[in-house]
Every structure is written in structure tokens, then in C-alpha cells.
Amino acid sequence: MKITVIGAGAIGGNLAVKLSAAGHDVQVADARGPEAVRAEVLESGARAVELADAVQGRDVIVLSIPFGVAGQLADLFASVPDETVVIDTSNYYPGML
């Protein structure tokens, strides 16, 4: 499967590593840019991409970002086809809202 993980932190990075090891075509995007993706994630075979390029042509998109910033991605998802699976692993932090 073609999978994008948005968020290169502990959860997103580990998911990218495991999904790559399982043979999936994985790309990772982070709001801080491709350079924010940790070396061990890239060594797994996942590719770092710009956030603007992260959602096109993918079967699955995994959100691994803080809960409070998910709404900032609305424009990014405007052109995502209805059949694309979106999985949200976002974290809620007390005091975030």
C-alpha cells in the first residue's frame, strides 16, 4: 500500500518504521519540513516529503499530530479522494483546547 504518515514524532515515526518493514511504500511529512524526519525512520525505507506533497496518490494517510493542530490541515485534505483511508492517531494534551 502507498501510505503517508503526517507527523514525524514518536508515534508517527515508529508507525512509519513498522509500516516500511512490512513492505509498504511509506512517506513521512512533518510541519517542520523533511529535515525533521529522524534518521532511523529514513533508514527503514520511508521517504521524507514536503507536507504539501504528502497526500496525493496515497491509499492511506495516518495523522500522528497534536489534536489541536489537525484543523490546520483542512486545505491539504480538500483534494483527497473519498476512497482514501484516513487514520487519526492524534494526541490530546491537557490544556490544549
What are these regions (language model features)?
Residues 1-43:
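NAD(P)+-binding Rossmann beta1-loop-alpha1 motif at the extreme N-terminus of oxidoreductases
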Residues 45, 49-87, 91-96:
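Rossmann-like NAD(P)-binding element
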